[in-house]
Structure formats: structure tokens, C-alpha cells
């Protein structure tokens, strides 16, 4: 029997998206039964968000910074992934492969195939927003504004409304 997935390992793009949407502080509320992990290597990638993240880590119980110190198989997997992908994505995928946790990333070009082949669950920014809408954290109008704000601030995200988005992830 597989162990229950209890951690969401968040990559920099999701953190950046939620910051650009002005709703970073809401991210840990979307899946409150999960521990949100920001690996140190990802934290280093988002230096402009350190103050916001530090405040969340200090005051919220379900978000934490974790030192990325892979050993043995995880270290080899990370090194292999790093040849093709960014350090943050590589760290998140290697960590989740060896811990059976969930990757939080919208960089589908990099993570989708690897996660599917290795049976790693992943959630994207739109998946997070979908669940925020379904759980009444945000209204449809708020979700659609967040999506547009993220796009307006230069991040890649599909031009879609939350009502038309089809989420395939069950958490």
C-alpha cells in the first residue's frame, strides 16, 4: 500500500504566480491538510519573495523551508534531471520521486512527462486556483482576475476562465 501524500513541494513558478496575482498568502489555505514545502534551492531562486515567504513560514504552520540535501539515489536523480531541466524543477521532481509527495509546478513542458512516467502527482497554478474556487476561498471573478494579473505581469498561463478550466488532479 502506498503511503498517503502529505506534502506539496512548491516550485518557484507557482510562488511567483501567486505573488504576481497578489495572493501568495492564500496558497497554503488551498490544501490545508497538506504540508507545503519550499526546498532551499527553490527559495534561492525567488529572492524577491524572501520577505513574503519568510513571514508565511514564520506565522503559518503548514508551510516550511526545507534544506535540499539529497543523498544516494536522490542525488543521482537530481544530477540526471539537472542536465535537462532547471535546478528548482529538478530538485522538486527528485524529492517527490523519492518521498512520494506532490509537485506544485506549472512548468508542464519540464515536469509533465517525468511526473507521469514516475507516477508523481503534480498540481499547477490553475489547479490551485480551481480548488480555491471550489472551496470558496476565491470567487470565480477573483480567480479570473488573478489569472489575468499573472498574465499581465508577464508570466505564462493559459488565457482561460476558471469556469472553463478542467482540473484533472484529485487531492
Question: How would you name each of these model-derived features?
Answer:
Residues 86-102, 110, 131, 149:
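Acidic, metal-associated active-site segment
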Residues 111-171:
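Acidic, PIN/NYN-like endoribonuclease modules and their adjacent C-terminal/linker elements
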Residues 5-10, 18-20, 25-70, 126-130:
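PIN/NYN-family metal-dependent endoribonuclease catalytic core
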Residues 63-83:
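Acidic catalytic patch
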Residues 10, 105-106:
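Short beta-strand scaffold positions
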Residues 36-38, 102-105:
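Short, hydrophobic beta-strand segments that form beta-sheet elements in well-ordered domains
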Residues 14-15, 42-43, 92, 110-111:
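Alpha-helix capping/helix-boundary segments
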Amino acid at each position: 500500500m502506498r503511503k498517503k501524500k502529505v506534502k506539496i513541494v512548491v516550485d518557484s513558478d507557482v510562488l511567483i504566480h501567486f505573488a504576481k496575482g497578489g495572493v501568495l498568502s492564500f496558497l497554503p489555505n488551498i490544501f490545508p491538510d497538506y504540508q507545503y514545502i519550499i526546498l532551499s534551492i527553490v527559495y534561492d531562486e525567488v529572492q524577491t519573495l524572501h520577505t513574503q515567504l519568510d513571514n508565511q513560514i514564520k506565522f503559518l504552520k503548514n508551510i516550511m523551508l526545507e534544506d535540499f540535501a539529497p543523498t544516494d539515489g536522490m542525488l543521482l536523480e537530481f544530477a540526471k534531471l539537472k542536465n535537462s531541466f532547471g535546478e528548482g524543477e529538478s530538485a522538486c521532481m527528485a524529492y517527490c520521486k523519492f518521498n512520494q509527495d506532490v509537485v506544485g509546478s506549472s512548468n508542464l513542458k519540464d515536469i509533465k512527462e517525468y511526473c507521469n512516467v514516475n507516477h508523481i502527482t503534480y498540481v499547477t497554478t490553475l489547479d490551485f486556483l480551481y480548488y480555491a474556487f471550489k472551496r470558496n476561498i476565491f470567487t470565480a471573478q477573483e480567480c479570473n482576475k488573478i489569472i489575468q494579473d499573472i498574465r499581465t505581469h508577464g508570466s505564462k498561463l493559459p488565457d482561460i476562465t476558471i469556469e472553463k478550466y478542467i482540473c484533472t488532479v484529485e487531492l
